[in-house]
Amino acid sequence: MSKSENLYSAARELIPGGVNSPVRAFTGVGGTPLFIEKADGAYLYDVDGKAYIDYVGSWGPMVLGHNHPAIRNAVIEAAERGLSFGAPTEMEVKMAELVTNLVPTMDMVRMVNSGTEATMSAIRLARGFTGRDKIIKFEGCYHGHADCLLVKAGSGALTLGQPNSPGVPADFAKHTLTCTYNDLTSVRAAFEQYPQEIACIIVEPVAGNMNCIPPLPEFLPGLRALCDEFGALLIIDEVMTGFRVALAGAQDYYGVVPDLTCLGKIIGGGMPVGAFGGRRDVMDALAPTGPVYQAGTLSGNPIAMAAGFACLNEVAQPGIHETLDELTTRLAEGLLEAAEEANIPLVVNHVGGMFGIFFTDAESVTCYQDVMACDVERFKRFFHLMLEEGVYLAPSAFEAGFMSVAHSEEDINNTIDAARRVFAKL
C-alpha cells in the first residue's frame, strides 16, 4: 500500500470519511485521495514523493501559487508578535482599508473566518435590514453550509424549498426559493409570487460549484434590476471569484453593483479568512452599531490578516490578472484542440483564472441542467488518467479548476500534452 492509502485507512477510523471537507475524499471520482506533504509554486507533492501540476489551488486561494514568499514571511513576522489577542489591531484597519479600496462597492467590511460565515452573516444582515424572511438562491450554486443554504428546489419553480441535508429543518428551508441560474424568468416569477417577502438574492457571479458557468450577458444586470424593482438586496458571493476574475471581482468584470459582497479564499492568502461588506447604510445595521448580531472569537486574527494583506498587495500588482487570463485561455484552447484531435466531445468554460471541463456533445454549458447532462463517468476516467500523468485536477465533475500566476508556459504545455495522451485512451 502507498503511504496515502495507509493514511487514508487510519484517517477513516478517526475522521468522518477520513477528511475534514467531503470533496477531498474523492467520492466524486473514486479511489484514494492524495495526502499532501508540501506544495510550492504550481506544484503539490504527495506523501509518496510524487509531484503534480496543481489546478485545485487549495480550492481557489492560491492565485499566486503555493508557499509564496511574501505571504510566508508576513505570517512568520505576525506569529512572532502573538497568535491571537481578542482585541482590535492596526492590521485589521489596514486590511479593511485595502479591501474597500480594491472593491469600490464595499463602503464597509466585516472580517470573519470563512466563506460560510460571510454568506450566512450577509443573509442575516439582509433579512434584518429589509425586515423580510425569504431569500433567492440558484440551483447548482453553493454558498457554504449554513442551514438556509442547504436547500434544493421544490417540485416546481414557485414551490418552497426542501432541505437537501438531514439536520436542516423544513421550517428553515421554506424561506429559501431556488431559481434557475442564467434564467431571469424564474427569478421574476419568484418575486411576483412573493413581492413583499424576499429579502435578498444571493448569487455566484460565476457559478463555480457546478464546475464553471459564467453568467449570460443579461443575467447579473437583470438580477440588479429585479432587486431594485421589488426592494430586495443583491448579494454577490465572490468567495471564489473575488480578486481572481478581476482585481475588483466578477462584479467589476461584468459591470454590476451589489448591495453586499461576500469574500473568502484569496482574501486570506491561504489562511482561514472570509469577509462581507457593502453599502454603508446596510452595514450600519450590524452590531455593535445596529441590531443585527454577528461575532467571532478569531475574526480579524492577526496572523490571518497579515497573510491576507500580503496576498492582496501582491494580487494588486499590474499584470497579474492579464497573466491569469492568458494562461487559462492557453490551457482551455489547448485542451479543446487535443480533444478534437481525438474526436472527444468537450466544452471548456473559462473566465479569468477559473475554468471548467465538460464532456458533452452540447455546444455550450450554461446552467445546472446542462451540467447534469454531461458525461460524469468519462470525467472520472479522465481525472485518474491525468493524475497518473502528474496533473491534479479537481476530484469532481462539478468543481471549477483554478490557475495561478506561478504556472509557467511549460506547465501549461505539459498539461496539454498529458491530456492529449489521456484523450487517446478515452
Curated annotation (Swiss-Prot):
Catalytic activity entry: (S)-4-amino-5-oxopentanoate = 5-aminolevulinate
Gene Ontology biological process terms in this record: protoporphyrinogen IX biosynthetic process
Keywords, sorted A to Z: Cytoplasm, Isomerase, Porphyrin biosynthesis, Pyridoxal phosphate
EC identifiers of the protein: 5.4.3.8
PROSITE patterns per record: AA_TRANSFER_CLASS_3
Necessary cofactors: pyridoxal 5'-phosphate
Pathway as given in its UniProt record: Porphyrin-containing compound metabolism; protoporphyrin-IX biosynthesis; 5-aminolevulinate from L-glutamyl-tRNA(Glu): step 2/2
CDD domains the record matches: OAT_like
N6-(pyridoxal phosphate)lysine modifications at: K265
GO CC list: cytoplasm
Subcellular location: Cytoplasm
A single MF term (Gene Ontology): transaminase activity
Protein family according to the UniProt entry: Belongs to the class-III pyridoxal-phosphate-dependent aminotransferase family. HemL subfamily.
Subunit relationships: Homodimer.
Listed name of the protein: Glutamate-1-semialdehyde 2,1-aminomutase
